[in-house]
Amino acid sequence: MKTALVILAAGKGTRMNSDLPKVLHPLAGAPLLIHAMQSGASLGPSRTVIVAGHGAELVQKAALSHDASAIIVQQTEQLGTGHAAKQAQDALKGFDGTVVVLFGDTPFVSPDTLSAICDAQRSADVVVLGFEAADPARYGRLVMDGAQLDRIVEYKDATEAERAITLCNSGVVACNGTRLFELLEAVDNDNAAGEFYLPDIVGVARARGLTAAVVTCDESETLGINSRTELSAAEAAFQERARTNAFENGVTLPAPGTVHFAFDTVVGRDTLIEPNVVFGPGVTIESGATIRAFSHLEGCHVARGSVVGPYARLRPGAELSENVRVGNFVEVKNARIGTGTKINHLSYIGDATLGEYTNVGAGTITCNYDGVLKHHTEIGNHVFIGSNTMLVAPVQIGDHAMTGSGSVITSDVEPEALALSRAPQIEKPGMATKIINLLRAKKAKQQRGS
């Protein structure tokens, strides 16, 4: 059966106390909205509709950058979740499959749970996602009639018996596309807030003799984020889950609580990740690599057997082939490093291609920016770059070439050539002692004057 997603992302997020729309606050390196979109994408939806409101332009930009086919609609007035869902009606015109309504601030609903919701919708007119709450607090309660969902009761309206129910409402629903909007049309705003609530479609459906079912999930999947405190708790939950997954996939983390993963980090088995490593978005680490302490990686690929760090930074576009070494205080950006090449200390390699088994000495800098444009540096195979070499791009260093320490290389270097570019050394006997004596005399004179 075909599915469509409606993701509600119109809320202001007042408790965030931020100019940024709530659904765009980052969790593990990606906006909350993107987490919801990724989870929903597991269903292979034929249409994805994002209901934007507060900060609609920013929400639209983020959504379309992740999925260019997403349909963006606006809720110009925030009149409740039912009213928000109704804004998707035109975008889903003629769609008769299952519509799943998610929330942009609820990032952890799993693909397995979404699949179960869609399966349940084949035999029920309305499906609600519920959870057994450890502390039901003020959640809405799901009142069952045997296997059927009879009604949803908000905490403030519940009797003592209903408040004792621990099966709670997550807010996520699924319904046939045509029927969803028929039910929403009948929902009223006769409540204290004067809003139209999405869960009220259950009462409308039951009054019409339709069926309603509940699919349950772990409470952790339903975590909604409305404040910085809840965002922090969600980050902690994500990181704990990511570390557990890493262990299960054969990754060694001697100090797991100090390693920070992004939402899309991929790490191969038999990789060692030392303490205080941070992964930004877009990192792939192959099997058998080592990421040493205090390194920061984003938008990069590290192949099998490579060693990164300690205190290294790999920026977007860094591509390390097998058995590469990138050592302490080395930064690599938009550069491909060939097999067996070593950049062991205190260097910047940007906008460059390095061949195989090349050695880059300490203090080497690719001078890639002229103040307006970036330029490329090409270094061949089996090259030796002497310490403190400045490579002024655009420049090419041929295979088996060498550069002398302290050189400023501004022109291409032929294969097997030695390139030197520095002033000749001048030695003046006894001059060091004379200079020291002059300086000491000057210092003594200054002290007498004070």
UniProtKB/Swiss-Prot annotation:
Q: Does the keyword Metal-binding apply?
A: yes
- Annotated region (Linker) at 229-249
Which cofactors, by name?
Answer: Mg(2+)
Residues bound to Mg(2+): D105, N226
Give the Pfam families listed for this entry.
Answer: Hexapep, NTP_transf_3
State the pathway, as annotated in the record: Nucleotide-sugar biosynthesis; UDP-N-acetyl-alpha-D-glucosamine biosynthesis; N-acetyl-alpha-D-glucosamine 1-phosphate from alpha-D-glucosamine 6-phosphate (route II): step 2/2; Nucleotide-sugar biosynthesis; UDP-N-acetyl-alpha-D-glucosamine biosynthesis; UDP-N-acetyl-alpha-D-glucosamine from N-acetyl-alpha-D-glucosamine 1-phosphate: step 1/1; Bacterial outer membrane biogenesis; LPS lipid A biosynthesis
Query: Per the record, GO CC terms?
Result: cytoplasm; membrane
Binding positions for UDP-N-acetyl-alpha-D-glucosamine per the UniProt entry: 8-11, 22, 75, 80-81, 140, 154, 169, 226, 315, 333, 348, 359
GO molecular function annotation: glucosamine-1-phosphate N-acetyltransferase activity; magnesium ion binding; UDP-N-acetylglucosamine diphosphorylase activity
Q: What is its main location?
A: cytoplasm
Q: What does this protein do?
A: Catalyzes the last two sequential reactions in the de novo biosynthetic pathway for UDP-N-acetylglucosamine (UDP-GlcNAc). The C-terminal domain catalyzes the transfer of acetyl group from acetyl coenzyme A to glucosamine-1-phosphate (GlcN-1-P) to produce N-acetylglucosamine-1-phosphate (GlcNAc-1-P), which is converted into UDP-GlcNAc by the transfer of uridine 5-monophosphate (from uridine 5-triphosphate), a reaction catalyzed by the N-terminal domain.
* Subunit structure of this chain's protein: Homotrimer.
What is this protein called in UniProt? Bifunctional protein GlmU
Q: Species name for this entry? A: Roseobacter denitrificans (strain ATCC 33942 / OCh 114)
Gene transcribed to yield this protein = glmU
